[in-house]
Amino acid sequence: LPLYRQEAIYARDQVEIDRSQMAQWMGKLGFELEPLADYALARIKQGERVFADETTLPTLAPGSGKAKTAYLWTYVRDDRPFGGSGPPIVAYRFEDSRAGECVARHLDGYRGILQVDGYAAYNRLARSDRGNDGVMLAACWSHVRRKFYELHAAGSSVIASQTVAQMAP
C-alpha cells in the first residue's frame, strides 16, 4: 500500500504520521531484513528447481515527481509437488533494469533447473560462456500453451490445434 494512502488512512482515524517518517521506517526495516532476504535467496539456490519471473513496478524517480519503470524479480523454490518436504520459499529482488545481468547476479552459483517464461534475459544463465553452464532452462507450460493456442485460434496450424487439445485438462 503506498505511503500516501497509509497516511490518509491514519489521518481518518485522527492519527497523524508524516509520510516522510514512514519512509524512514521503511528504509530502516529494509536494512534490518536484508540478512533474511539474502538467506531466503541462498536457500532457494540450494534447490534442484527454481521458478523465476520479473514484473514491472512503477516507482517515483527521486526529485522528478514522475514514475519510472523498475522491476521486481521473483525467485521461488517449492519442492512439494516433487516429493520434497521443505517449505516453499520466495525471494524478491528490486532492480531498475530487466537486463540479464540482474538475474545472473541474483542466481550466481546456482546449478539446476530454472523454470521461466521464455524471456531472453534468462538465457544468459544457461550459456556456457557466461560461467553458469550448470543451469538448464525449462519453459513455463502456461506460456508455451499460449503460443500454441494463438496459432490454433488463427486456424493456421493443425498441429497447434492438436497440441492444444492434448494439453487441455
What are these regions (language model features)?
Residues 1-169:
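Catalytic center-proximal scaffold of phosphoryl-transfer enzymes
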